[in-house]
Structures are given as C-alpha cells and as structure tokens.
C-alpha cells in the first residue's frame, strides 16, 4: 500500500487571508514529499471557498516549482469545463516543466451547483459522456495530428503542443463510482480514483466489488491501480487531550 495526498486551498469565508491558506497548503505538499507520499493531488472546483481550485494544472505548476520528487496529479480535470486541445496542451506543458511528474486524472464533475455556472443546462448525472468522449481525444492529440468531429467537440487537424515528456502519455486516472465508469477505465487502460471521503468504509468495499466485476468482465486488459480517498486526521501527539484536529483527504493506493 502506498499513500498519496489530496489537498485543497480551503477556508470557510474571506476572513482568512489567502496568503496564509496558500502557505499552509504548500507546506503540507512539501511535508508529504519528505514523508514519502507518492503523489500530491489538486482538484478542480469553481466559486467554492472551501475548495479553491479554479485550475488544477496551475496549482500543480506552483507545487512543481517548490518540490523535487513527489508526483503531481489532477484529481480531477472536469472534462465538460475544457476544450480537448486546451487541456492536452496544458497537461503536456506541466509534464514538461515538472520533469515528467504528471499523473493525469480526469472525471465527470461532482456538483450541480458548479455545472449551473460553468456549463449551464448540463446535468451532473449526464457529464460522464463528456469525459468518455474527451479521454480518447486527449490520447490522440498527445500522439500526433488529429481531427475530431464528436458529440460535444469538433475541430480540424490539431495536435498537442508541447507533447508530454512521459511516453506515450502520463499515467491516466479516471474518477469512478459507478459500474459504467469502472468499465470505461478498465477498457481504456486507466487507473482509478474513488471518493468514499468520510462515509462508512462499506462504500469503498462496494466500489471495490464493482471494480472487480469490471476487471472480470474485461479480460485481456491490464489490472488498474485503485486509489481510495479517505479524510484522515493527523495529530502531533499520542495524548488525546492535546489533539489539534486537522483533517486531510489522503489517498491510499491499493
């Protein structure tokens, strides 16, 4: 089992200084690197003080310039909010300047509130279709010239500039909590991120059973790595009386 860190710039309201929020967040990423964590993950969310992450690739660029070894992951880039040419190029540029440390996570998006602002008219429950169109397009753009005429995006012959350092592309992770997405990830050779967060661990066990069913149904594909996010409390003392409560989302990779 390996451990990863998923952390956001967070505050309850604008009474807390953003410089302090940023300092604390970077300190935690640097501590994770020194502690042997394998990946630091940045989210994408919009207009939420509790998850300040308007562009995960910008956040990871910042972390890349202040770390040396830890790998850097998007958890996740929300497909419906991006154009494929834009996302392919930005992700590849991060892979370049980080020395090939990108772990590319893509997903459907979590909150209807955000879709109402970022993609009006799109139901969160339908956004998986954008993700499933987007991912194959990204792979083709990273590989070379490609023209696309799809349900959600169309563009003439284009390519990713630059190309990723990692060949044929960075490791790809798909956010999955349903059988249709587990199936898609397995068939496309992707690793998997699941978010039980703080719910009973039975939810993680349910996701694992769905993943196992997908693996069994699609023989001949590589077995994906599965990372599970759990909110984890970290203390600086074994004495419960002196606990300073701090909860961080931590991924366990199995």
Language model features with spans:
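Flexible, glycine-rich active-site loops centered on histidine and acidic residues
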Residues: 1-18, 80-148, 192-194, 198-202
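Hydrophobic faces of well-ordered beta-strands that scaffold small-molecule active sites
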Residues: 3-7, 40-42, 72-74, 102-106, ...
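Generic structural signal for well-ordered alpha-helices
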Residues: 25-29, 57-61, 88-92, 132-139, ...
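Acidic (Asp/Glu)-rich catalytic clusters
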Residues: 60-68, 95-101, 186-187, 218-221
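Conserved small/polar residues in nucleotide/adenosyl-binding loops
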Residues: 244-250
């Amino acid at each position: 089992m390996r451990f990863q860190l998923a952390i956001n710039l967070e505050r309850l309201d604008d009474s807390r200084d953003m410089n302090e929020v940023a300092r604390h967040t970077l300190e935690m990423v640097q501590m994770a690197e020194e502690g042997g964590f394998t990946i630091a993950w940045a989210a994408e969310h919009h207009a939420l003080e509790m998850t300040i992450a308007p562009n995960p690739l910008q956040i990871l660029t910042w972390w890349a310039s202040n770390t040396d070894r830890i790998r850097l992951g998007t958890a996740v880039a929300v497909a419906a909010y991006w154009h494929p040419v834009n996302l392919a190029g930005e992700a590849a540029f991060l892979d370049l300047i980080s020395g090939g440390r990108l772990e590319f996570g893509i997903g459907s998006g979590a909150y209807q509130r955000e879709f109402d602002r970022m993609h009006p008219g799109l139901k969160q429950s339908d956004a998986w279709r954008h993700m499933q169109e987007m991912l194959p397009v990204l792979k083709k753009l990273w590989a070379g010239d490609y023209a696309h005429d799809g349900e959600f995006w169309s563009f003439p012959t284009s390519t990713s500039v630059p190309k990723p350092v990692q060949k044929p592309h960075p490791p790809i992770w798909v956010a999955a909590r349903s059988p249709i997405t587990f199936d898609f990830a397995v068939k496309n050779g992707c690793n998997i991120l699941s978010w039980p967060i703080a719910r009973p661990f039975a939810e993680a066990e349910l996701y694992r059973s769905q993943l196992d069913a997908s693996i069994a149904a699609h023989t001949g594909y590589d077995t994906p790595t599965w990372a599970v996010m759990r909110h984890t409390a970290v203390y600086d003392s074994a004495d419960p009386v002196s606990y300073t409560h701090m909860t961080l989302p931590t991924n366990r990779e199995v």
